Amino acid sequence: MSTAKSDIKKVTTHQLQEMKNRGEKISMLTAYDYSMAKILDAAGVDVILVGDSASNVMAGHETTLPITLDQMIYHASSVIRAINRALVVVDLPFGSYQGNSSEALRSAIRIMKESGAHAVKMEGGIEIKESVLCIISAGIPVMGHLGLMPQSIYKFGTYVVRAREEEEANKLIADAKILEESGCFGLVLEKIPASLSKTVTHQLQIPTIGIGAGPDVDGQVLVTHDLLGINNEFHPRFLRTYANLQATISTAVTSYIDDVKSKNFPNENECY
């Protein structure tokens, strides 16, 4: 017997906090379309991130900067239609919240109203405090993001591990506390030393989600296409691949082409 959609217990920000409190790890993956989101949700992932990484993964851009608010809303809407259980968090894209809390609020409201998302995610520390406060005051949950921040790639100049030096590490800890005090329900820590993420996780009450941040965080996130081995050109140290779908897809497509060329598809059982 199938479970009615209304009977499925949905993941909420409060449940993520409860998971941290009892020591249960949080699973988080990316999705940008209905089909992938449906698979991830049915598999039981706790959080689905509609990331601005869609700029790289779906559109082939070198950075996350080109993706627009309208495009993020399109991807988020597609994901939301597939979801029965998971919490869906959507990245506010570059240019939609930096430097102006009123603009940040308008962007967050558009995402929530037009896509049906459950929360938004923002990169930055003290510099986005006013925007975070403004968005949360409107009843919109916010997840923070510190460490390597892809929207600031031209500031950093490279995608190397962040906060190795004491000064930057201390700033990250301070920023994490500011985001928590501002009301963020969770925090992504990207590509920082494992010892630092452990310190941050122990000092915060809210859940931390790591990507390239070691094991001592409250949960982990990966880009689903990387986990599935769809893009075999990307091999960061932190990535564990669980499949080689690039090879699987290539083999399937090659077989299809061969069958078409050789007139083996369709056969009589595949005709009306």
From Swiss-Prot:
Organism: Cytophaga hutchinsonii (strain ATCC 33406 / DSM 1761 / CIP 103989 / NBRC 15051 / NCIMB 9469 / D465)
Pathway membership: Cofactor biosynthesis; (R)-pantothenate biosynthesis; (R)-pantoate from 3-methyl-2-oxobutanoate: step 1/2
Keyword Signal: no
Protein's recorded name: 3-methyl-2-oxobutanoate hydroxymethyltransferase
Physiological role: Catalyzes the reversible reaction in which hydroxymethyl group from 5,10-methylenetetrahydrofolate is transferred onto alpha-ketoisovalerate to form ketopantoate.
Family from the record: Belongs to the PanB family.
Cofactor: Mg(2+)
Location(s), subcellular: Cytoplasm
Gene Ontology biological process: pantothenate biosynthetic process
Binding sites annotated in the UniProt record for Mg(2+): 52, 91, 123
Catalytic activity: 3-methyl-2-oxobutanoate + (6R)-5,10-methylene-5,6,7,8-tetrahydrofolate + H2O = 2-dehydropantoate + (6S)-5,6,7,8-tetrahydrofolate
Binding site for 3-methyl-2-oxobutanoate: 52-53, 91, 121
A single MF term (Gene Ontology): magnesium ion binding
Keyword entries, A-Z: Cytoplasm, Magnesium, Metal-binding, Pantothenate biosynthesis, Transferase
Pfam family, one: Pantoate_transf
Record gene name: panB
EC number(s) on file: 2.1.2.11
Subunit structure: Homodecamer; pentamer of dimers.
One annotated Gene Ontology cellular component of this protein: cytoplasm
Residues the record marks as active site: 190 (proton acceptor)
Principal EC category: transferase
